[in-house]
C-alpha cells in the first residue's frame, strides 16, 4: 500500500513534527517521508480533505466484545467494526467472556479471530481464575502467550491477600496489573451514586467510599510491594487527590477515567432511564470538575470508552434489575472534543487516547517520524455532527447519546498496511 496524505496537521507530542502541517507519504506499512510538500507519481493514491489532522492511532484501554459466550451482545467482528468507526486502531480487550480469558487457550482463540485486521487487539486476561477472586491465573504462561495485562475488571479483586500476591508476581514482568477500585461490601445492592438524587428517587446508593477505600488499599499494597498498578474507571474527587498524592510520593501508579463519567452526573437518572445505569455510577458536578482538573494536570493518564454492550432485554427492566453498561466507541471522540475542548488542548486529549495507553501498557511507540510503522488516525476536530442510530455499529444499542450534537470525527485509519476511509 502506498498513499500520500496531503496537508495534514500532526498532533503527536512525541514527534519532532508536532503541530506542523505536512505531507506524509506512507509506503509498505511505513512512514517513508514527511515534508512540507511531497511530489509523487500518478500511481500513488492521494488522500486530502479540509482541516486534516493526524495522530498516532487511537487506543482504547477498556472494550468488551462479548465473544465467546455473549455473542448476542457483541461479536469480536462487530466490536472491531465499532472501534474502526470511532477512529481506534488499537483496543485492549477485557476478559469478561464466558468462559473468561483466564488461560492461554482463550488467548489463542482471540488472537486467531483478530489476526490480519486493521485493528490491533491486545488481550487482558483475568487476574483470578474464572474471575472468582480466589486463585491467581497462570500469569507467566499467559504473558508468554501474548497477554499484556491482568484484571478482573468490574468484578474487582476483593481479597487484599490475593492482590498483594498478584502485585509481587507481576512486579518483574512486562505486564500491567489493573484494578477497578470498588469494595462490594460497601456497594452492596447500590445502583446509582449515594446522595440527594438516590434519596429522591428511592434507589439504593453506591457511596464514594466504596471506591476510595479500595483505592487506599491498592496504593498501600503498591507501596509495600514496590510494584506498579493501574487504577481503572475513577469517578470521585477524593480518588483523584489520592492518585495525585501517590504519584507525588513516587508510587508507580497510573489511572484512567471512563468518558461518560467526565461530564454526566447522577441527575441523569432522574427519569429512571437505564441507559444511564453504569458502574461506577455518575457522581456529582464537583466530582466531574475534579476529574477534568485531574486530566488537565496529568493525574489521570487515560480516557477510555468502557465500551460495554448489553442486550435490550437486560436494559428494559426496572432500574434496580437492569444491568450496568454503556457502549461508547462510535461516539467517543465527538463527545470528548465537545466536552473537553475548553479545558484541554488537542495535544493533551490525543495523549489520553493514544500515546499514554501505549506507554502504560509497554507497547512500542508509533511516533509520527520517518521510518516508523504507520499506525495512524486521520481526523477533523472541528466537524460538527449529530450522533444517530445509523452510526451505531455495535450489536447492542445501549447508549443515551443518540441525537446528541457532537464535535470532532475520525475520517480514516492507516494500520497494518491497510487504509480505510470511515
Model-predicted segments: where are they?
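N-terminal metal-binding scaffold of metallo-dependent hydrolase/deaminase domains
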Residues: 1-40, 418
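C-terminal cap of metal-dependent C-N hydrolases
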Residues: 8, 318-321, 373-422
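Divalent metal-coordination and catalytic microenvironments
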Residues: 8, 24, 29, 51, ...
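Active-site metal-binding motif and surrounding structural segment of the metallo-beta-lactamase
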Residues: 38-54
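Metal-associated gating/positioning segment near the N- to mid-region
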Residues: 52-114
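Active-site mouth loops of central-metabolism enzymes
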Residues: 61-74, 122-135, 204-208
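Histidine/acidic residue-rich metal-binding segments in metalloenzymes
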Residues: 137-303
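His/Asp/Glu-enriched, well-ordered alpha-helical/loop segment
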Residues: 200-226, 296-297, 302-303, 308-381
Amino acid at each position: 500500500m502506498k498513499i500520500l496524505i496531503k496537508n495534514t496537521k500532526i498532533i503527536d507530542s512525541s514527534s519532532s513534527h508536532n503541530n506542523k502541517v505536512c505531507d506524509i507519504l506512507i509506503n509498505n506499512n511505513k512512514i517513508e517521508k514527511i515534508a512540507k510538500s511531497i511530489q509523487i507519481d500518478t500511481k500513488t493514491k492521494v488522500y486530502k480533505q479540509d482541516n486534516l489532522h493526524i495522530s498516532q492511532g487511537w487506543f482504547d484501554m477498556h472494550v468488551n466484545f462479548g465473544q465467546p459466550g455473549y455473542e448476542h451482545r457483541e461479536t469480536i467482528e462487530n466490536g472491531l467494526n465499532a472501534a474502526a468507526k470511532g477512529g481506534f486502531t488499537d483496543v485492549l480487550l477485557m476478559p469478561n467472556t464466558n468462559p473468561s480469558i483466564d488461560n492461554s487457550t482463550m488467548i489463542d482463540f482471540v488472537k486467531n479471530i483478530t489476526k490480519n485486521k486493521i485493528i490491533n487487539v491486545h488481550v487482558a486476561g483475568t487476574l483470578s481464575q474464572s474471575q472468582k477472586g480466589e486463585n491467581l491465573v497462570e500469569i507467566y504462561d499467559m504473558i508468554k502467550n501474548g497477554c499484556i495485562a491482568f484484571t478482573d475488571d468490574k468484578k474487582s479483586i476483593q481479597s487484599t491477600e490475593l492482590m498483594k500476591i498478584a502485585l509481587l508476581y507481576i512486579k518483574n514482568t512486562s505486564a500491567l496489573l489493573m484494578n477497578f477500585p470498588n469494595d462490594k461490601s460497601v456497594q452492596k445492592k447500590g445502583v446509582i451514586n449515594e446522595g440527594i438524587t438516590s434519596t429522591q428517587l428511592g434507589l439504593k446508593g453506591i457511596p464514594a467510599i466504596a471506591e476510595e477505600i479500595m483505592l487506599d488499599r491498592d496504593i498501600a499494597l503498591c507501596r509495600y510491594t514496590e510494584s506498579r498498578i493501574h487504577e481503572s474507571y475513577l469517578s470521585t474527587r477524593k480518588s483523584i487527590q489520592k492518585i495525585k498524592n501517590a504519584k507525588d510520593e513516587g508510587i508507580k501508579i497510573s489511572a484512567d477515567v471512563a468518558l461518560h463519567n467526565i461530564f454526566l452526573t447522577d441527575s441523569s437518572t432522574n427519569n429512571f432511564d437505564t441507559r444511564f445505569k453504569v458502574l461506577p455510577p455518575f457522581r456529582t458536578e464537583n466530582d466531574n470538575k475534579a476529574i477534568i482538573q485531574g486530566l488537565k494536570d496529568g493525574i489521570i493518564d487515560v480516557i477510555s470508552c468502557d465500551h460495554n454492550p448489553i442486550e435490550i432485554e437486560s436494559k428494559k427492566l426496572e432500574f434496580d434489575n437492569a444491568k450496568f453498561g454503556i457502549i461508547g466507541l462510535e461516539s467517543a471522540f465527538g463527545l470528548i472534543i465537545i466536552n473537553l475542548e475548553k479545558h484541554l488542548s488537542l495535544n493533551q486529549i490525543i495523549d489520553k487516547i493514544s500515546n499514554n495507553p501505549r506507554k502504560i501498557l509497554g507497547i512500542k511507540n508509533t511516533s509520527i517520524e520517518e521510518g516508523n510503522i504507520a499506525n495512524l488516525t486521520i481526523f477533523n476536530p472541528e466537524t460538527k455532527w449529530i450522533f444517530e442510530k445509523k452510526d451505531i455499529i455495535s450489536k447492542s444499542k445501549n447508549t443515551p447519546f443518540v441525537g446528541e450534537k457532537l464535535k470532532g470525527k475520525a475520517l480514516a485509519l492507516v494500520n497494518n498496511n491497510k487504509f480505510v476511509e470511515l
